Amino acid sequence: MKLLALCATGLSLMLSFTSCTNNKHLISDAAERNAVQQDFETRRSKLSHGDLFQVFEQPMSDEQREALTFLYAYMPLGDITDYSGEYYLENIDYSLKAREEMPWGKTIPEREFRHFVLPVRVNNENLDDSRKVFYEELKDRVKGLSLHDAVLEVNHWCHEKVIYTPSDARTSSPLASVKTAYGRCGEESTFTVAALRSVGIPARQVYTPRWAHTDDNHAWVEAWVDGQWYFLGACEPEPVLNLGWFNAPASRGMLMHTKVFGKYQGPEEVMVQTPLYTEINIIGNYAETAKATIKVVDANQQPVPDAASNSKYITTPNSIPLPTKQPMPTVKPS
């Protein structure tokens, strides 16, 4: 009996030690981790009524807790109140599962995984269980493929599920699009981003508010492959990436942008930074770009402080204001 008790104690100690050493950080940089934690605490202090954050009382790994903290720090208020913490925790578990089981999972950098795989929301769709459903259906289909070929294969799968049909209603959820088997470009791209993320592939929805040649807009998808972002037409499979019907008009577009979940610090130009998301300009992925500086002076050729400029481009029959970059706040020296 004493020997058995000793063995059991030793086993208990070994399991405890293993559990501690297996706890990995989702955010390895301590400064970034602390910044997310501070944003989360600020958010939680403003939503102190009720049990909106009760899920954090559950036992979980450091990786799960940091992922949950990241989501709650930056998700829209409605997503906190309308969906349970258990829902987000399950989505996190499937994201981590995909990273562990997909052959490319360990090659995805922390930043791209955090901002372009982990988030559940893509647009203004209702959230659903698509990550779990899509993962179970796609995991064997992309088995043995390279990351590049997996992106192409997922888009083929999306084409089998959804075709283009114009609509004006609120963006349908990924599972709703599968059920109806149709969607406009914003819904097809929401669906395709969700499908790519379900198997651990960083993906984002790209939007141009107006083409240069016509008074219309479009949305499509970019996927991260081996250090580079590639574009694809959602549910419009091609044999290679960076090929779509919109190649030519995109090369003349005045703005291609995407809204990134959280405070994103990537190489792209930041147009707008809010407490919850980062809007970035990615037109450089589609056309050669150059910076132009407009100097506003008075009659004496002196700079006019805080002058507003308004530039437009012409589309028949309209003139459309060009997008502007939000001025970054200046910090006065103390």
Where do the model's predicted regions map?
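Secondary-structure boundary elements
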Residues: 28, 37-180, 215-216
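C-terminal motif of bacterial Sec signal peptides marking the signal peptidase cleavage site
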Residues: 17-19
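Short Pro-Gly-centered beta-turn/loop motif in secreted/extracellular proteins
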Residues: 329-334
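A short, amphipathic beta-strand motif
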Residues: 290-298
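Bacterial N-terminal signal peptides that target proteins for export
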Residues: 1-7
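Short, ordered, surface-exposed loop/turn motifs in non-cytosolic proteins
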Residues: 299-325
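Bacterial Sec signal peptide processing site at the extreme N-terminus
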Residues: 21-30
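Hydrophobic/aromatic-rich core segments of domains that either
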Residues: 137-141, 145, 150-156, 165-175, ...
